[in-house]
């Protein structure tokens, strides 16, 4: 029996060697773009590029834009609940789990996403701008680019088996961390952990992309509002 809020997925058809090879090429190109922008600053921001690649690739290879994974879920209530629980887990990790690990490993912070967006306590314009970017560029752009596209293509390489999806999640979480290279080694590690939790929720909800999008948006919204109100630095 399916859980409410999830979509029943037919067992994936086996992929041909050619299809798997093409997915390997796509994943390699996507990963190279992430590194080229964030580490070497050799190409423009990777998120819009991955977003366009995702739209084109999914349309051509999977037949329709519906395959993107943003169709109407069976239950919005359950979808939002899963996203909210995911957000709570990520925020709790950020308070109690990753900081001691970061300290133990001797990792360093550079600057936070809030700092890069110019978010300041009591500044209404800065928080509105940050929230606008969060719910477009980050929540939709990053989740489609990283969780839907790169994770999907990485899993294709292993013929979309359950194990392949979880190995793909580890790989894409590492790339997601590198996507926040500007935050320093501590930021890379922390965002990789956050990306893993969001990605795990995505997989456990039977690849309901709304779970990842809403969780990502909720996490950033709570953090930004806390900074705006002075509850957090």
Which residues are covered by each model-predicted region?
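Short helix-terminus and kink motifs of transmembrane alpha helices
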Residues: 63-66, 95, 99, 143-148, ...
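Alpha-helical transmembrane segments in multi-pass membrane proteins
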Residues: 18-67, 78
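Short, Lys/Arg-rich, polar N-terminal cytosolic tail immediately upstream
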Residues: 1-18
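Structural signal for membrane-spanning alpha-helices in multi-pass inner-membrane proteins
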Residues: 33-37, 53-61, 90, 94, ...
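Transmembrane helix-loop junctions in multipass membrane proteins, especially transporters and channels
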Residues: 42, 62-63, 99-107, 181-185, ...
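Residue-level signature of transmembrane alpha-helical entry/exit and packing/kink sites
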Residues: 19-27, 46-50, 75-83, 126-131, ...
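Transmembrane helix-loop-helix hairpins at the membrane interface
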Residues: 123-233
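Juxtamembrane helix-loop-helix connectors linking adjacent transmembrane helices
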Residues: 67-138, 156-159, 231-233
């Amino acid at each position: 029996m399916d859980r409410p809020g999830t979509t029943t997925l037919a067992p994936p058809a086996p992929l041909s060697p050619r299809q798997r090879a093409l997915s390997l090429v796509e994943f390699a190109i996507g990963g190279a773009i992430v590194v080229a922008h964030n580490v070497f600053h050799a190409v423009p921001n990777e998120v819009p590029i991955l977003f366009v690649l995702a739209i084109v690739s999914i349309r051509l290879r999977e037949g329709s834009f519906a395959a993107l994974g943003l169709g109407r879920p069976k239950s919005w209530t359950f979808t939002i609940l899963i996203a909210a629980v995911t957000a709570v887990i990520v925020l709790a990790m950020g308070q109690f789990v990753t900081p001691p690990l970061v300290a133990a490993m001797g990792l360093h912070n550079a600057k936070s996403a809030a700092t890069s967006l110019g978010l300041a306590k009591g500044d209404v314009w800065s928080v509105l701008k940050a929230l606008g970017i969060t719910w477009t560029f980050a929540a939709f752009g990053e989740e489609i680019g990283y969780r839907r596209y790169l994770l999907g293509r990485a899993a294709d390489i292993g013929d979309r088996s359950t194990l392949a999806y979880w190995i793909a999640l580890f790989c894409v979480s590492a790339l997601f961390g590198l996507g926040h290279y500007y935050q320093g080694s501590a930021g890379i590690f922390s965002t990789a952990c956050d990306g893993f939790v969001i990605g795990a929720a995505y997989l456990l909800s039977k690849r309901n992309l709304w779970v990842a999008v809403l969780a990502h948006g909720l996490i950033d919204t709570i953090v930004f509002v806390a900074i705006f109100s002075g509850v957090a630095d």
